Amino acid sequence: MRALLPYLALYKRHKWMLSLGIVLAIVTLLASIGLLTLSGWFLSASAVAGVAGLYSFNYMLPAAGVRGAAITRTAGRYFERLVSHDATFRVLQHLRIYTFSKLLPLSPAGLARYRQGELLNRVVADVDTLDHLYLRVISPLVGAFVVIMVVTIGLSFLDFTLAFTLGGIMLLTLFLMPPLFYRAGKSTGQNLTHLRGQYRQQLTAWLQGQAELTIFGASDRYRTQLENTEIQWLEAQRRQSELTALSQAIMLLIGALAVILMLWMASGGVGGNAQPGALIALFVFCALAAFEALAPVTGAFQHLGQVIASAVRISDLTDQKPEVTFPDTQTRVADRVSLTLRDVQFTYPEQSQQALKGISLQVNAGEHIAILGRTGCGKSTLLQQLTRAWDPQQGEILLNDSPIASLNEAALRQTISVVPQRVHLFSATLRDNLLLASPGSSDEALSEILRRVGLEKLLEDAGLNSWLGEGGRQLSGGELRRLAIARALLHDAPLVLLDEPTEGLDATTESQILELLAEMMREKTVLMVTHRLRGLSRFQQIIVMDNGQIIEQGTHAELLARQGRYYQFKQGL
């Protein structure tokens, strides 16, 4: 239960709407009970009056009460659903924002151990499951308790013994049934949450890996694993449905026994009258209607195990401490940036081998640096240190002679423009995919930058309104690289980090892109990670890395004259 406390605290923000929903639920329940109780008494009293030949029976007042209760029940149910669901959606919106805001600082270190499907399931499905806490647990429980009190007190004016007998049965049922079915459904609910996450994780992996699975003939094997998980998931759902049916059956049985007990006790007299008359129907129908108000409570607590399991899974993410933190102080963004690295050392979590070993580097403002080396030598890790995806365990990084850790996050993001190794294409329009780098850019500026990076073909159909990603046009690897370069050019930051910007491009396009970068980034500080040797002669410095260390550094001509590793790379062309 403790896992729910942080999320119950979030409900305070919408306490008035949530409270109004509970009040409307109580009014609806009381109107429903009043309708059946008054109708039963009215019909019975009318029959008794007819048999007795009474002509003074007031038909108008009870009839008006029946109509009033019916209208109140209908209107109350409508507005209760409207208010409760609106409040629930607001709480879910707040919860999603809260969860996502907690996730952002964790990337990439805190999220590296989770698969994409698992993260998606926790952020979407587990958050959605928490709406059961209000709709299926809190509201029915509070409503049932208030209804029991009102019914007991109301009936006590007619007969104290009958009222408190019925109230005691309902109160005992309310205290015993929910904990009983919570325990019965706890393991099933936890299993459902686990299997749902496992299924979505496997489904995501199966869909994303279709090409490789088909090529290597492993698609059927993975499909079988997916089907087995689905069967287990359906079996858990079946067990939960059986528990729901059992709880409803027990509630019907208790309700029926309570009705029989009321009928037997009321037959001996009501309120001191040996002849109960139509009042016997009033107590019987009140008992029948009151137990309908208790019906949702047992089923609700059966789902509580699933709600708690989802809360634990979300808290497992949100309670993590970020590896990298930013100060809250305001920092001015510089127009030009120099860069200094002093004895930077870094090791990835749960790995023994150092990714960076004593990196020391001085980059002057406006200088262009190329970083060369084989795969896994630490080039991309070095760029990640500059974006503060990770912080070094030893050494320091300075921007304009100030520690990079002294910049707040907004200032750092404005200072650095990045072309990442893995470019993400959002399922959105071409315009939206570019505006994330420069929200204030005009359509003319976006179209011009696309033409300059060789993506003018994307403008042929629907122009900037062309839909990209899922449900739209897919981009090739080379097109994705050029889109990332377009974003970097639009961002217009003084420090530019390029991670394999020409990977996947043909020689002609590569030369055009390198010329474009040299032209548009002439006054900027540039660090480019690459495997390719084309165009490196235009860089002021070339750094060769191996095994997390800088092994060579100098100009193109100097490195060729030394006939070291860079020379060997050139000779291997």
From Swiss-Prot:
It is found in: Cell inner membrane. Overexpression of CydDC confers resistance to exogenous cysteine toxicity. The keyword Cell membrane applies. Residues 158-161, 271-276 are periplasmic. Keywords: Amino-acid transport, ATP-binding, Cell inner membrane, Cell membrane, Membrane, Nucleotide-binding, Translocase, Transmembrane, Transmembrane helix, Transport. It catalyses: L-cysteine(in) + ATP + H2O = L-cysteine(out) + ADP + phosphate + H(+); glutathione(in) + ATP + H2O = glutathione(out) + ADP + phosphate + H(+). In CydC the ATP-binding domain (NBD) and the transmembrane domain (TMD) are fused. ATPase activity is stimulated by various thiol compounds. The presence of heme leads to a further enhancement of thiol-stimulated ATPase activity, although a large excess of heme inhibits activity. Glutathione transport is inhibited by sodium orthovanadate, an inhibitor of ABC-type transport systems, but not by the proton ionophore carbonyl cyanide m-chlorophenylhydrazone (CCCP). One of its GO terms (biological process) is heme transmembrane transport. Belongs to the ABC transporter superfamily. Cysteine exporter (TC 3.A.1.129.1) family. This is Glutathione/L-cysteine transport system ATP-binding/permease protein CydC. Disruption phenotype: Mutant lacks functional cytochrome bd complex. Mutant grows normally and remains viable during stationary phase but is unable to exit stationary phase and resume aerobic growth at high temperature. Its EC number is 7.4.2.-. Residues 1-15, 58-136, 183-249, 298-573 are cytoplasmic. Forms a heterodimer with CydD. Induction: Part of the cydDC operon, which is highly expressed under aerobic growth conditions and during anaerobic growth with alternative electron acceptors such as nitrite or nitrate. Induction by nitrate and nitrite is dependent on NarL and Fnr.
